[in-house]
């Protein structure tokens, strides 16, 4: 018969009592009342915060955007097809954040920073909030370094500086994305990290852009954030913030970054869809009242940091699409008022064969020549004024039957200057090449060249300079000034190349 030993039993009970953990885990739960169109209405969730992530039974995650008296309006970050009425939901106590690391370079990710290029997971030990506050006034310094786009028309007349926000605006099919991708390609060897955010675009268009970047060797310093047209509106709305968080990671590591949002019109439309489904009151063009804040809090994250924070920079090039050239619509005027200038692309110029189709009269950079090297200021200072005067002359010349020789010469030079500003896609030019090109055009060296042959002549001149006068490029790169020596070398090269070109044409 087994003998019961009371002292042994009491010691076991005492041990159990000592090991007892009285910690109670409180989970804030709710129930789905209604689900559909990427929106769920939830009863309960009394402790939920605005913008908090909530998790559904099937693992789908949503963001609590509407906190109402009787229910909570949640936008889903997924299709939500398996969520049913009556399913349970719990709060997570977190707001949206993404992993960040150097391993993201060269990769294609979605709005949740998950890889979508089929090249396996991305290792990251750090996290950043998707929506983090912009640097304050004390944390910034004024923009003073140029960010070269490689496009003569922009770098000479509408210069962009590191830490600036410059809007690219125009109708569909006017070359907005081409300007942005050329800028990324031109950052090769400039120690600039690029982030390209594609919002609501066709998958085929995105694939073409990635192919171009790969062929030009630009993917090694670029991250592509993709949410195509068939993505849920929530993810299209989040994608730009994800891109900004990835770019900020590098900015705070004392690096220079460039981010392109292609395009913010589609993000505004996704946000409008979410807001209307959440029954928020519509305003102008049915956009919600806070659509300005949607873009301002995103674009204010672009900055040039002060020396205490490492002088890193985040330059933003948002793209906005207009309808029939109407820049006075709601979203275009909002973004124009937030940014430090705009590059306006005209469909008339594009159709006339002037590419990039930049309307110099309507485009402006509010940073101005502070974002140019001294050599560019010396050479291109009067170019914008000269083009404006020629455009005015052309409008008068339409009504005049006979023009004096001076006017005819000015109009002929205008044609050559326009030809000089034309550039093929994916062929950005180095600063010294741009300076040589502008100097040749503005000082009348193209006046004797046929308009049709200007492009060929300039291409040959740039090659001739590189091969026979490498000192010219060296002077511009090292001194960043258009010295007398550089000018003498350039004039010599122009004269030699003109002689060669004339002989070529005769043969």
Swiss-Prot record:
Is Nucleotide-binding found in the keyword set? Answer: yes
Site, Required for activity: residue positions: 363
The subcellular localization recorded is:
Plastid, Chloroplast thylakoid membrane
InterPro entries found in the cross-reference section: ATP_synth_asu-like_sf, ATP_synth_asu_C, ATP_synth_asu_C_sf, ATP_synth_F1_a_nt-bd_dom, ATP_synth_F1_asu, ATPase_a/bsu_AS, ATPase_F1/V1/A1_a/bsu_N, ATPase_F1/V1/A1_a/bsu_N_sf
Q: What Gene3D superfamilies does the record tag this protein with?
A: 2.40.30.20, ATP synthase alpha/beta chain, C-terminal domain (1.20.150.20), P-loop containing nucleotide triphosphate hydrolases (3.40.50.300)
Q: How does it sit in the membrane?
A: Peripheral membrane protein
The region annotated as signal peptide is none
Q: For ATP, which residues are the binding ones?
A: 170-177
- Function, in words: Produces ATP from ADP in the presence of a proton gradient across the membrane. The alpha chain is a regulatory subunit.
Record's family? Answer: Belongs to the ATPase alpha/beta chains family.
Please give the NCBIfam families that the UniProt record associates with this protein: atpA, PRK13343.1
Q: How does it assemble?
A: F-type ATPases have 2 components, CF(1) - the catalytic core - and CF(0) - the membrane proton channel. CF(1) has five subunits: alpha(3), beta(3), gamma(1), delta(1), epsilon(1). CF(0) has four main subunits: a, b, b' and c.
Q: What is this protein called?
A: ATP synthase subunit alpha, chloroplastic
Q: Which organism is it from?
A: Welwitschia mirabilis
């Amino acid at each position: 018969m087994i003998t019961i030993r009371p002292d042994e039993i009491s010691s076991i009970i005492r041990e159990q009592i000592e090991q007892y953990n009285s910690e109670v885990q409180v989970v804030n739960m709710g129930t789905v009342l209604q689900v559909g169109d990427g929106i769920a209405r939830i009863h309960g969730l009394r402790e939920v915060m605005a913008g908090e992530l909530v998790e559904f039974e099937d693992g789908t995650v949503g963001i609590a955007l509407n906190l109402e008296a009787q229910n909570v309006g949640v936008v889903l970050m997924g299709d939500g097809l398996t969520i049913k009425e009556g399913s349970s939901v719990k709060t997570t106590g977190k707001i949206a954040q993404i992993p960040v690391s150097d391993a993201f370079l060269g990769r294609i990710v979605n709005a949740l920073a998950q890889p979508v290029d089929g090249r396996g997971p991305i290792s990251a030990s750090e996290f950043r909030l998707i929506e983090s506050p912009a640097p304050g006034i004390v944390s910034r310094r004024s923009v003073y370094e140029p960010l070269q786009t490689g496009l003569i028309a922009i770098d000479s007349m509408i210069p962009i500086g590191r830490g600036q926000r410059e809007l690219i605006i125009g109708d569909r099919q006017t070359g907005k994305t081409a300007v942005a991708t050329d800028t990324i390609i031109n950052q090769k060897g400039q120690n600039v990290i690029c982030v390209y955010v594609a919002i609501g675009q066709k998958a085929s268009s995105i694939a073409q852009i990635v192919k171009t970047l790969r062929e030009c060797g630009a993917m090694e310093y670029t991250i592509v954030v993709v949410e195509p047209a068939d993505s849920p509106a929530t993810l299209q709305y989040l994608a730009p913030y994800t891109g900004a968080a990835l770019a900020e990671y590098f900015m705070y590591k004392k690096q220079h970054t460039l981010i392109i949002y292609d395009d913010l019109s589609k993000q505004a439309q996704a946000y409008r869809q979410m807001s209307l489904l959440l029954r928020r009151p519509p305003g102008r063009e049915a956009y919600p009242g806070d659509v300005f804040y949607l873009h301002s809090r995103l674009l204010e994250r672009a900055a040039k940091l002060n020396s205490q924070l490492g002088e890193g920079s985040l330059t933003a090039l948002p793209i906005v699409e207009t309808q029939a050239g109407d820049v006075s619509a709601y979203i275009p005027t909002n973004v124009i008022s937030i940014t430090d200038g705009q590059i306006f692309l005209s469909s008339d110029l594009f159709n006339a064969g002037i590419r990039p189709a930049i309307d110099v009269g309507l485009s402006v950079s509010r940073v101005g020549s502070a974002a140019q090297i001294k050599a560019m200021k010396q050479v291109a200072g009067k170019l914008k004024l000269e083009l404006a005067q020629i455009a005015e002359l052309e409008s008068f010349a339409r009504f005049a039957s006979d023009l004096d020789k001076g006017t005819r010469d000015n109009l002929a030079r205008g044609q050559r200057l326009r030809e000089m500003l034309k550039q093929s896609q994916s062929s950005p030019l180095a600063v010294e090449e741009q300076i040589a090109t502008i100097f040749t055009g503005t000082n009348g060296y193209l006046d004797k060249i046929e308009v049709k042959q200007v492009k060929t002549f300039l291409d040959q001149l740039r090659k001739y300079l590189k091969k026979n006068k490498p000192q010219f490029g060296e002077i511009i790169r090292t001194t960043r000034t258009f010295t007398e020596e550089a000018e003498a070398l350039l004039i010599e090269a122009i004269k030699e190349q003109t002689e060669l070109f004339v002989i070529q044409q005769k043969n």
